[in-house]
A protein has these predicted regions:
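C-terminal reverse transcriptase regions that engage the nucleic-acid substrate
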Residues: 40, 88, 116-236, 372, ...
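RNase H-like nuclease fold core
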Residues: 189, 250-293
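RNase H-like nuclease module associated with reverse transcription
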Residues: 122, 247, 281-391
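Metal/cofactor- and membrane transport-associated sequence elements
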Residues: 1-113
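Mobile genetic element proteins and their domesticated derivatives, centered on retroelements
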Residues: 2, 18, 42, 54, ...
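Alpha-helical coiled-coil heptad-repeat oligomerization segments
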Residues: 59, 99-110, 174, 191, ...
Length: 391
């Protein structure tokens, strides 16, 4: 559902005055100004005023704001659970009872001028396909537009988004290129990662050279575009699980000093709900890790923070507590360090914030488990893989 002229519904808490608009100036009061009662588009207060108005309306209808995600509102329990996701003036409604959904729509129509856009097919650039088997998310049209804008439509495709063992540097001696053009392309690719975890590492890697890009960096970006050209239909499929309840399962991994400029490692985090990927993350670590154990431990802590938040959000959506989150790690030393303070001489310098995982393991919220390197699914988020491992 879409709210028409949403910002005009916001009620101002501050005194705001505006000049009389041309064509509506009161004769004899030309030098007077108008006192606004409601918000107008262009006011700094308008977005906040609209959000406060919508929040008030949803709370009045019996909804509760999610403590984990403030853009999500919840009503009812179990089979009568109604979930409303909010993005500015767009509302996504999900529930197991059609009567409850229709009732909510009627109540919203009586409160605001609304447009009912029907079943969700397209949202913020994401194409949504729903069936009895599940839901598929992709960005085919958006990806095709990127190729068209960059002049790469119909280019020769590649099997992987980045060459294995490729190492780029900020100190590249290759000819410089227009930074604005480079940033525009990479920024577009960053949004595509929302439904393409296979692009997370490569896009994150080329994002490190936004300040002074060269033709060498642009070549890596074009490689990503060539890969996209051959995988336009790729996206995320979420299968409906009918028998048992889907469990939250996470994977964390890291490379070792992969950034040749700073020698910092890259963290890769991937979470599944059942067999469905729900969140992924590839980012350069904040500190230089002195060992593979430390790099893996930092990555595991990052995954723990994400897993705790996901478990809390899922608990709210389901209306019941989620069990312990399993976290798969392919480094035995990091697992041992998460369970007890071993290797003191080699780990005593690690920042205290990275020891948060120990508390979560101790109180049972997270279970760290060993997994083989070849089975580590988060590996794709930490380095450029060869074709046989990437596919």
């Amino acid at each position: 559902m879409d709210v028409k002229s949403a910002f005009l519904n916001g009620e101002l808490q501050e005194d705001v005055y505006v000049e009389q608009p041309p064509g509506f100036i009161l004769r004899g009061h030309e030098r007077k100004v108008l006192h606004l009662v409601k918000a107008l588009y262009g006011l700094r207060q308008a977005p906040r005023a609209w959000y406060a108005k919508l929040d008030e309306s949803l709370l009045r209808l019996g909804f509760q704001m999610s403590t984990s995600e403030h853009a999500v509102y919840l009503h009812g329990a179990r089979d009568r659970r109604l979930v409303v996701g909010v993005y500015v003036d767009d509302l996504i409604i999900a529930g197991g009872n059609q009567v409850d959904i229709d009732t909510f729509k009627q109540e919203m129509h009586s409160t605001f001028k609304m447009s009912d856009l029907g079943r969700l097919h397209y949202y913020l650039g994401l194409e949504v396909s729903q069936s009895e088997e599940g839901i598929t998310l992709c960005q085919n049209a958006y990806a095709a537009k990127i190729l068209e804008t960059t002049g790469m439509t119909g280019c020769k495709s590649t099997c992987t988004p980045m060459e294995p063992r490729l190492k780029l540097s900020k100190l590249s001696t290759a000819p410089a290129i227009d930074p604005t053009h480079y940033r525009s392309i990479v920024g577009s690719l960053q949004y595509l990662v929302n439904t393409r975890p296979d692009l997370a590492y490569s896009v994150g890697y080329v994002s490190r050279f936004m300040e002074s890009p060269t033709t060498e960096h642009l070549g890596a970006v074009k490689r990503i575009l060539r890969y996209i050209s051959g995988t336009l239909s790729y996206g995320c499929q979420y299968q409906r699980k009918k028998k048992e309840e889907a469990r939250l399962l996470g994977y964390s991994d890291s490379d070792q000093a992969g950034d040749i400029d700073t020698r910092k490692s890259t963290t890769g985090v991937l979470f599944f709900l059942g067999n469905n990927p729900v969140t992924w993350q590839s980012q350069k670590q904040k500190v230089v890790a002195l060992s593979s154990c430390e790099a893996e431990y930092i990555a595991a802590t990052t995954a723990t923070c994400q897993g705790i938040w996901l478990a809390r959000l899922i608990s709210e959506l389901r209306g019941r507590e989620a069990g312990a989150t399993s976290l798969k790690i392919d480094n035995e030393s990091a697992i041992a360090l998460s369970k007890n303070p071993v290797f003191h001489d080699r780990s005593k310098h690690i920042d205290v914030r990275y020891h948060f995982i120990r508390e979560c393991v101790e109180d049972g919220r997270v279970k760290t488990e060993s997994i083989g390197t070849t089975e580590q699914l988060a590996d794709i988020l930490t380095k450029a893989l060869a074709r046989d491992r990437f596919c």
